[in-house]
Swiss-Prot record:
One of the primary rRNA binding proteins, it binds directly to 16S rRNA central domain where it helps coordinate assembly of the platform of the 30S subunit. Transmembrane segments: none annotated. Belongs to the universal ribosomal protein uS8 family. InterPro entries: Ribosomal_uS8, Ribosomal_uS8_CS, Ribosomal_uS8_sf. It comes from the Bacteria. GO terms for biological process: translation. The keyword Magnesium does not apply. HAMAP family: Ribosomal_uS8_B. Part of the 30S ribosomal subunit. Contacts proteins S5 and S12. The lineage of its organism: Bacteria, Bacillati, Mycoplasmatota, Mycoplasmoidales, Mycoplasmoidaceae. This is Small ribosomal subunit protein uS8. NCBIfam families: PRK00136.1. PANTHER family: 40S RIBOSOMAL PROTEIN S15A.
Length: 131
């Protein structure tokens, strides 16, 4: 059975924050690494590290971020799914919680936040909302 790497990543992070874990382990891919880089730059996670677990197999350990025992990530929602892709133009990119959250957008220039996509005037596939 095929498991979408984006939904797997978001589900593991969501479960980890609900159970107050310090870190979660996810499968490694370029897409997952790019999403984690955005979450790190926006201050939603402390960091991540890729580890080798065998021949041609890697896993990524994501260090979750907490402030006063409250998770930095209040919510995660996958928007575009393998069965239903959601695209948006640069002018119509969604605002998450009136700008308090971010939307992760896959553009022709790579993955970026909704703010960066508007600044660069590029649209693309809306991957997920994070707040």
């Amino acid at each position: 059975m095929y498991m979408d790497p984006i939904s797997d990543l978001l589900l593991r992070i969501k479960t980890g924050t609900k159970t107050k874990r310090n870190s979660v382990v996810v499968k490694t891919s370029k897409l997952v690494t790019n999403i984690l880089e955005i979450l790190k730059n926006e201050g939603y996670i402390e960091g991540f590290k890729t580890e080798s677990i065998g021949k041609n197999k890697n896993q990524t350990v994501v260090n979750l971020k907490y402030r006063n025992n409250v998770s930095s990530i209040t919510g995660l929602k996958q928007i575009s799914k393998p069965g239903l892709r959601i695209y948006s133009e640069a002018q119509k990119l969604p605002k998450v919680l009136n700008g308090l959250g971010i939307a992760i957008i896959s553009t022709s220039m790579g993955l970026m936040t909704d703010k960066n996509a508007k600044k660069n005037n590029v649209g693309g596939e809306v991957i997920a909302y994070v707040w």
